C-alpha cells in the first residue's frame, strides 16, 4: 500500500530539544540570529525564505532577510557577506538558491565565514563531510541531512540499500551521496547528462529514490516500481500554481504503483527548515560555549 511519509512529526521531535536550547541561550542574554540572502524572485527561493522567517519567529530566533533584485552587481552581494561575517550578532548566513547565472555561486558561497556556514556550502564544510569528520562543530547541508533524518525516523536502514539520487547539487545531491556512502549504501547519481533510459533503469533498480532536480512533476510511472521509498526534495510550481515536488504522484498512483513517499509541502522541507535553525543555535553555542 502507498504510504505518505510526513516530515512534520520529525520536525516536532527536533523542535522539543531546540526550544530548550534557545531558552538556555536567552537566559545568558544571547539571541540566535541568522541572515538570509536572496537574489531574484525564484518561487523556490521565496517559499524557503518564508518558511525560514515563519519558523524563526515561532522559535524566537532573530532573522534578517536581505533581498536583491536580479541584475544587482555581484560586488554588492559580496559586500553584504563581508559585513555579515563581521557582525558579531549574526550567527548564521544562508544564500538562497538558485542564484542568477551571471553570479559566481562558488565564489560567493566560499566568502561565508565557515563558523557561520549553517547550510554547509563552503569548501571547508564540504571537506569535513568528505573526511567524515564531526567533532561537534561541523555543519551539514540541511536538505541532505533532512533526507537522512526522514529515513532514520521511518526506521529505514540505509546500510546495504541501493539508492538512486537525481541531482548533483552542492546543497543536496553531492552531500547526500557522501552521507549515504558513509552509512554503507550503494549509490547511483543521475544528472542532466544521464541518458533517460539509463536514469529510468537506475531508478527502478533502487530501494530508495531521491528526487532533487527541481524538475517539477518530471518523474512519472516509468521511474518506479512497488515497494520503493521516494524522497521528494523538489519545490516548484505545479500546473495549478501551487507548490509541488519533482514526483508526478498522480501518475504514479494512477498506475497502481505502491510506493512510500514524502509529500510536498510537508515532507523534506518541513525538516530542512528546522535543521537550519538548529544549526543557527549550534553556531551561537559555539561562539559562546559557556
What are the functions of these language-model segments?
Residues 106-117, 126-127, 234-288:
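Rossmann-fold NAD(P)-binding glycine/threonine-rich loop
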Residues 31-40:
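Short beta-strand segments enriched in small/hydrophobic residues
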Residues 1-30:
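Positively charged, low-complexity intrinsically disordered leader regions
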Residues 94-158, 217:
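Anion-binding alpha/beta catalytic cores of soluble intermediary-metabolism enzymes, centered on
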Residues 56-70, 187-190:
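Short beta-strand elements in bilobed, periplasmic/extracellular small-molecule ligand-binding domains
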Residues 76-88:
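Short, well-structured alpha-helical segments in soluble
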Residues 38, 94-98, 212:
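Short beta-strand segments
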Residues 39-53, 137-229, 233, 238, ...:
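Glycine-rich phosphate/diphosphate-binding loop of Rossmann-like nucleotide-binding domains
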Amino acid at each position: 500500500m502507498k504510504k505518505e511519509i510526513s516530515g512534520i512529526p520529525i520536525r516536532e521531535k527536533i523542535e522539543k530539544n531546540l526550544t530548550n536550547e534557545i531558552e538556555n541561550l536567552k537566559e545568558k542574554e544571547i539571541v540566535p540570529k541568522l541572515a538570509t540572502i536572496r537574489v531574484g524572485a525564484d518561487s523556490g527561493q521565496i517559499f524557503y525564505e518564508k518558511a525560514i522567517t515563519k519558523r524563526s519567529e515561532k522559535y524566537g530566533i532573530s532573522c534578517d532577510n536581505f533581498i536583491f533584485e536580479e541584475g544587482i552587481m555581484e560586488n554588492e552581494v559580496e559586500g553584504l557577506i563581508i559585513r555579515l561575517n563581521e557582525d558579531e550578532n549574526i550567527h548564521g548566513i544562508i544564500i538562497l538558491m538558485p542564484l542568477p547565472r551571471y553570479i559566481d555561486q562558488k565564489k560567493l558561497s566560499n566568502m561565508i565565514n565557515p563558523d557561520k556556514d549553517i547550510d554547509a556550502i563552503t569548501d571547508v564544510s564540504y571537506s569535513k563531510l568528505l573526511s567524515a569528520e564531526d567533532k561537534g562543530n561541523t555543519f551539514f547541508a540541511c536538505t541532505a541531512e533532512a533526507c537522512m533524518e526522514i529515513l532514520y525516523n521511518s526506521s529505514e536502514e540505509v546500510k546495504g540499500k541501493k539508492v538512486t539520487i537525481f541531482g548533483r547539487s552542492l546543497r543536496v545531491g553531492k552531500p547526500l551521496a557522501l552521507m549515504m556512502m558513509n552509512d554503507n549504501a550503494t549509490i547511483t547519481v543521475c544528472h542532466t547528462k544521464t541518458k533517460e533510459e539509463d536514469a529510468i533503469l537506475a531508478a527502478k533498480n533502487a530501494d530508495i529514490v531521491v528526487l532533487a532536480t527541481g524538475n517539477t512533476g518530471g518523474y512519472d510511472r516509468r521511474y518506479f516500481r512497488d515497494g520503493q521509498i521516494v524522497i521528494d526534495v523538489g519545490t516548484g510550481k505545479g500546473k495549478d500554481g501551487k507548490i509541488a515536488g519533482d514526483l508526478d504522484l498522480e501518475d504514479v498512483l494512477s498506475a497502481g504503483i505502491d510506493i512510500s513517499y514524502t509529500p510536498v509541502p510537508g515532507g523534506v522541507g518541513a525538516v530542512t527548515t528546522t535543521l537550519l535553525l538548529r544549526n543557527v543555535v549550534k553556531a551561537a553555542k559555539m561562539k559562546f560555549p559557556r
